[in-house]
């Protein structure tokens, strides 16, 4: 159990599957945004990061609807606000250079709907098409954990962490999994090596609870951080890269 984390984290600290058939898709986008469109798209993405999803969607309506970037952000917004049109938007992107993002979005939709088997298929395909995308690997780990595959989830969290050196999301997910497994020594080693703070530890504790277990008492220092009180549903969403606020 300790070997994987020891080997996997070594490179990160020193330097900082089944697929769906026939959906390789083009690897590059030929469309390019003009300067004004790029500025508007950046504004839309800022609104999304701020949680102003309806405002972002309204701004997208003033842009050419056929642009792939517009279609991708529209699908993301519709998914986040729970609009059923999101599925069709993602499916329409499967044969474009946005196929990795489309499979990722479809996987998160499946996970939200409780279809963890389909979620794993879609997220595996997203990771196959873009294997170095940290958020795809992280979210695949969450889906695998929902399927009860802790070994697979651990592998994906470590991969995501090494791809995004210093990334708090895969780090806290991995720590949460270690708490879930009762791996106190590995958990403490991870905290020390990555210099995780009390807020990170509380987030990991909350995720471990939402994933089905309470962390071993004494495995982490106490804190008054409000993340410790987040409900299970909120923690499942914040464990996924594209769901974090």
UniProtKB/Swiss-Prot annotation:
Taxonomic superkingdom: Bacteria
Region (Disordered): 210-245
Name of protein: TPR repeat-containing protein PA4299
Organism: Pseudomonas aeruginosa (strain ATCC 15692 / DSM 22644 / CIP 104116 / JCM 14847 / LMG 12228 / 1C / PRS 101 / PAO1)
GO cellular component: plasma membrane
Endpoints of the signal sequence: 1-16
SUPFAM superfamilies: TPR-like
Lipidation residue positions, type N-palmitoyl cysteine: 17
Lipid addition sites, S-diacylglycerol cysteine: 17
């Amino acid at each position: 159990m300790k070997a994987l984390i020891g080997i996997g984290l070594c490179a990160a600290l020193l330097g900082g599957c089944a697929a769906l058939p026939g959906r390789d898709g083009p690897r590059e986008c030929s469309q390019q945004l003009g300067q004004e469109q790029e500025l508007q798209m950046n504004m839309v993405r800022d609104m999304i990061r701020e949680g102003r999803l309806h405002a972002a969607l309204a701004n997208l309506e003033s842009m050419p609807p056929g642009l792939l970037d517009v279609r991708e952000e529209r699908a993301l917004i519709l998914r986040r606000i729970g609009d059923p049109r999101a599925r069709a938007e993602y499916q329409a992107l499967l044969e474009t250079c946005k196929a990795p993002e489309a499979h990722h979005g479809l996987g998160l939709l499946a996970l939200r709907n409780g279809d963890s088997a389909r979620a794993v298929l879609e997220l595996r395909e997203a990771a196959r098409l873009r294997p170095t995308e940290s958020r795809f690997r992280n979210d695949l780990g969450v889906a695998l954990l929902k399927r009860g595959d802790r070994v697979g989830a651990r592998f994906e969290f470590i991969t995501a962490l090494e791809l995004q050196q210093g990334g708090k999301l895969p780090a806290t997910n991995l720590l949460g999994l270690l708490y879930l497994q009762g791996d106190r020594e590995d958990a403490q080693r991870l905290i020390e090596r990555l210099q995780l703070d009390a807020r990170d530890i509380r987030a990991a504790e909350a995720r471990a609870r939402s994933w089905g277990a309470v962390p071993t008492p004494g495995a982490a220092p106490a804190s008054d951080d409000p993340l410790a009180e987040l409900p299970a549903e909120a923690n499942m969403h914040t464990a996924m890269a594209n769901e974090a606020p």
